[in-house]
Amino acid sequence: MLGKNIKKFRLRKKLTQDKLARLADIPYTSITKIETGVIKKPSVQAVAKIAKALGVSIDVLIEGG
């Protein structure tokens, strides 16, 4: 669910996975693995960085707001 939500918000912002990775300062492979469900429980730090890069709260990112 988290991966799908990240992808949804990323596409709304018209960001590529690579661009989001750079904005969040996390590896590109982490973004792809989280979005596809390979990483099911990313670290709180990674989720916080992704949420900040997408301009949403962690709660909204997790719940899909």
Please identify what each model-predicted range represents.
Residues 45-60:
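DNA major-groove recognition helix of helix-turn-helix/homeodomain DNA-binding modules
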